[in-house]
Amino acid sequence: MFLKAVVLTLSLVAVTGAQAEVSANQVATVVWDYFSQLSNNAKEAVEHLQKSELTQQLNALFQDKIGQVNTYTDNLQKKLVPFATELHERLRKDSEKLKEEIRKELEELRARLLPHADEVSRKIGDNMHELQQRLGPYAEELRTQVNTHAERLRNQLTAHAQRMETTLRQNVDNLQASLTPYADELKAKIDQNVEELKGHLTPYADELKVKIDQNVEDLRRSLAPYAQDVQEKLNHQLEGLAFQMKKNAEELKAKISANADELRQKLVPVAEVVRGKLRDNTEELQKSLAELSSHLDRQVEEFRRNVGPYGETFNKALLQQVEELRQKLGPYAGDVEDHLSFLEKDLRDKVNSFFSTLEEKENQDMLVAVPEPQLTPVPLES
């Protein structure tokens, strides 16, 4: 039985690795972006549903992300594309229906909260203050970490470039043999340092999600006494708020990662230029190394300036979303168009459920497919 468990574990690792290449989040984003794009176009374009175009976009996920075809990914692709296109159809049909449901939900909530409008507004205001207190240190810490790790990256790469300059002066007669290892190592150091930079900065988004859950739960408890007979409707609105706030956290993570990748893309070509000039004369190579150091300084400084303020921008966005909830629940809200966030949340929940169900079935199939090891009886000694 132990051997069977080991084989199963290894199989699961292989499946998980393959599945990670195409995630539920990626699929949901493709479907949602396509839906939003059609919704924003002219009516004639919306009526002409481009099923083939959506199918192409979904298939492109597999072409771009998966290096080799295996049973799991092939099965996933065959089942996913029809599911996602059908889901897109339902989005278009459910949009107006959900819009009306949310309108009625907010009407009932406002009517129930109206006698306590001032207290409700004050409670939400208190929650915004608590949220600001919780998030403030994270924004400052993110800026500090960006500065610290960007400076560390700059120092390490600059020191490497300086070692190349020293080697250049000491080995004028044999430049290519002396500097080729340094040039190769420089590119590796760029990749390594950028990955370390991402590794230090992107976990902030996950920590922020925990703070968001805490804050939304605090808000739910503080408003519960005023919404005793409409608690489910209040919970639904708070779920929508949490979804929007966590989406901002995911976008923060993606922006940090994208900026780090962009930094890498700007640094690597310069390192390759230096390597390509190892056969040139000493003067040309010295010029390239000087340009490399200057380029490192500029690009790292640009990264620091771009990413440093992200924390403050994120905090403002979350506070604005809580303020919008206060306005929605207030007596003078008017018509509020916020059903799309609930529609997107429902879409992502369905895609996550699809992936979970498929993964569970795949694991069960593997469990059945792995045979019990047969133990050969050992003859007793006579």
From Swiss-Prot:
Which top-rank group of organisms is this from? Eukaryota
Q: Name one GO molecular function term.
A: phosphatidylcholine-sterol O-acyltransferase activator activity
Please name the InterPro entries in this protein's record: ApoA_E, Apolipoprotein_A1/A4/E
Q: Name one GO biological process term.
A: cholesterol efflux
Would I find Protein biosynthesis among this entry's keywords? no
Q: Does the keyword Zinc apply?
A: no
Which purpose does this protein serve, as stated in its record? May have a role in chylomicrons and VLDL secretion and catabolism. Required for efficient activation of lipoprotein lipase by ApoC-II; potent activator of LCAT. Apoa-IV is a major component of HDL and chylomicrons.
* Record comment regarding domains: Nine of the thirteen 22-amino acid tandem repeats (each 22-mer is actually a tandem array of two, A and B, related 11-mers) occurring in this sequence are predicted to be highly alpha-helical, and many of these helices are amphipathic. They may therefore serve as lipid-binding domains with lecithin:cholesterol acyltransferase (LCAT) activating abilities.
Q: Where in the cell is it found?
A: Secreted
* Gene Ontology, cellular component aspect: chylomicron; extracellular vesicle; high-density lipoprotein particle; low-density lipoprotein particle; very-low-density lipoprotein particle
UniProt KW keywords: Chylomicron, HDL, Lipid transport, Phosphoprotein, Repeat, Secreted, Signal, Transport
Name of the protein: Apolipoprotein A-IV
Disulfide bonding pattern of the chain: none
Under the subunit heading, UniProt states: Homodimer.
Q: In what way is this protein post-translationally modified?
A: Phosphorylation sites are present in the extracellular medium.
Region described as 13 X 22 AA approximate tandem repeats: spans on this chain: 33-330
sequence repeat extents: 33-54, 60-81, 82-103, 115-136, 137-158, 159-180, 181-202, 203-224, 225-246, 247-268, 269-286, 287-308, 309-330
PANTHER family per UniProt: APOLIPOPROTEIN (PTHR18976), APOLIPOPROTEIN A-IV (PTHR18976:SF1)
Q: What is the species listed in this Swiss-Prot or TrEMBL entry?
A: Leptonychotes weddellii (Weddell seal)
The stretch of residues making up the signal peptide is 1-20
The family annotation for this protein states: Belongs to the apolipoprotein A1/A4/E family.
